[in-house]
Regions:
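A short beta-loop-alpha structural element at the N-terminal edge
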Residues: 1-15, 22-27, 75
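Conserved active-site alpha-helix within GNAT-family acetyltransferase domains
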Residues: 123-131, 159-160, 183-201
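Conserved GNAT acetyl-CoA-binding A-motif
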Residues: 139-141, 168-182
Length: 214
């Protein structure tokens, strides 16, 4: 069943995140929260989005396995969730990051080093398709994440979640949805391209942003 997420789903959503993004910096903060203390920052992160845009946070709820996937995003003229998260958790994030670095945690070191290496004075995103540039941010949304547990893929969960997500966005007057993906994530790129997205911009060889007219 595909349904809107609730706060009771957050621990299961974090579990899906940890499995699907096991080597990410965000997962490290979540994995080590019991050792370092301060609560699970991933729960706090997703809660910000769930509170602000509950209709844009959907889950795949399997009868036998429970929550096996989620899809979420935000409206581009109401994109202060990350800012709110950092404002409320900045000290915890810094403290945990420092301890993880001292412990030699590789994903954390990679994140910090990338942050210092890549600090352009202007945006290094290059728009390659401007045919929808007349559509304002007040009519745009962003699909931030769609993921399904590996052993539950191929059953249509991702497709059904994304359709519900895009329908909710369209019902609220959005005309364009953006989504970004790493250039080397060929599986995700093929999936999005099968769903009729168009390339919008590039960031060197690192990332791509697609767009879909609603």
């Amino acid at each position: 069943m595909i349904r809107q997420a609730t706060t009771q789903d957050l621990p299961a959503i974090v579990h899906v995140h940890r499995v699907c993004f096991a080597n990410s910096y965000s997962s490290q903060l979540s994995y080590y929260q019991s050792v370092i203390g301060g609560g699970d920052l991933l729960i706090s992160f997703y809660l910000e989005y769930m509170k602000d845009n509950p209709e844009l946070f959907v889950v795949a709820d399997d009868e036998e396995k429970g929550i096996v996937g989620f899809c979420m995003g935000y409206y581009m003229d109401k994109d202060d969730q990350m800012q709110n998260f950092l404002h409320n958790n900045r000290i915890k994030v810094i403290w945990k990051t420092m301890l993880l670095m001292l412990a030699g945690n590789k994903p954390t070191w990679n994140k910090v080093l990338a942050r210092f290496k890549h600090r352009p004075s202007v945006s290094d995103w290059v728009i390659v398709n401007d045919k929808y540039e007349q559509i304002l941010n007040s009519q745009r949304g962003d699909l931030l994440s769609v993921c399904v547990l590996p052993d539950c893929r191929g059953k249509g969960y991702a497709q059904d979640m994304m359709e519900k997500f895009l329908a909710a966005m369209k019902e609220r007057g959005r005309r364009l949805c953006l989504l970004s993906v790493e250039t080397n994530n060929l599986r995700a790129r093929r999936y999005y391209e099968r769903n009729g997205v168009e390339l919008y911009r590039k960031r060197g060889g690192e990332g791509l942003t697609y767009m879909k007219l609603l």
